[in-house]
């Protein structure tokens, strides 16, 4: 099994990195099905979209296929948020998150030689393409709609701060490894809320491959271990966080949790 730390995310499609991470977390992840389905969509797109069309026309046709004929859409009807993040489930149900829908669309677009790239906007992942004339086109991966600067500023003011401003670097191409880390963070939170603690632990372990000494990730792993009633390991992880980040406002709460676990161990013994 390849390691996430050794994988060159930026030299591979985003889907490849997501599939590798998924294989490490879910023993039942159907890698072959996902690749077969991605290839099927590429073939359908190649049949429908003429290479003689302009770049803009090809992209418009791809968006019409993806969100129209193929029916990909956002995850409003999905019962469990984690189902909107796993590529196999998104390909089956056609409902996903910005990252999962964006990754599938990027896979197809790049196979058609359309230079679509991911952007980690402060509120969600968006997609960007530059025309041959140098004009930038921004796309919302939830629905394929074009985004203008006014819409992005409204998102910033509504979600970040009423005084937030849009900067050029907000629209820079994202590092694939960073997209994967953000996806795994969201997946871990979703699995914890869904009480799928064993899977959440595997996500935490995957995230630690990027930065094995990250105190915040070690803290989260400790909290998951505590939920799984692995108190001894939980104490080790939570204590590490408190030692590394004594000034962090959440440290006081973690200290209280450490005391609760330690007291529970004394009572049990």
Swiss-Prot record:
Gene ablation phenotype (knockout): Not essential for the ability to invade cultured HeLa cells (the invasive phenotype).
Pfam family name, one: Transglut_core2
InterPro entries with a match to the protein in the record: SirB1_N
Superkingdom of origin: Bacteria
Task of the protein: Required for maximal expression of sirC, not required to invade host cells.
Family: Belongs to the UPF0162 family.
UniProt name for this protein: Protein SirB1
Gene that this sequence comes from: sirB1
């Amino acid at each position: 099994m390849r390691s996430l730390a050794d994988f060159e995310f930026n030299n591979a499609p985003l889907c490849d990195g997501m599939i590798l991470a998924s294989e490490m977390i879910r023993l039942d992840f159907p890698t072959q099905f996902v690749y077969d389905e991605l290839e099927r969509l590429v073939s359908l797109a190649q049949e429908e979209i003429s290479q003689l069309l302009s770049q803009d026309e090809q992209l418009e046709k791809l968006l019409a296929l993806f969100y129209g004929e193929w029916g990909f859409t956002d995850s409003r009807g999905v019962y469990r948020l984690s189902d909107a993040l796993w590529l196999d489930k998104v390909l089956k149900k056609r409902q996903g998150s910005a990252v999962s829908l964006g990754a599938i669309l990027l896979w197809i677009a790049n196979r058609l030689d359309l230079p679509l790239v991911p952007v980690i906007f402060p509120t969600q992942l968006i997609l960007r393409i530059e025309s041959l004339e140098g004009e930038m086109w921004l796309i919302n991966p939830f629905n394929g709609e074009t985004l203008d600067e006014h819409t992005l500023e409204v998102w910033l003011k509504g979600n970040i701060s009423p005084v937030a401003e849009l900067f050029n670097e907000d629209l820079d191409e994202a590092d694939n490894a960073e997209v994967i880390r953000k996806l795994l963070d969201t997946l871990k939170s979703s699995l914890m809320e869904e009480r799928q603690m064993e899977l959440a632990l595997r996500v935490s372990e995957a995230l630690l491959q990027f930065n094995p000494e990250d105190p915040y990730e070690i803290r989260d792993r400790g909290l998951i271990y505590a939920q799984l009633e692995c108190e001894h390991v939980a104490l080790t992880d939570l204590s590490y966080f408190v030692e590394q980040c004594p000034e962090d406002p959440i440290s006081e709460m973690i200290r209280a949790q450490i005391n609760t676990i330690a007291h529970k161990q004394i009572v049990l013994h």
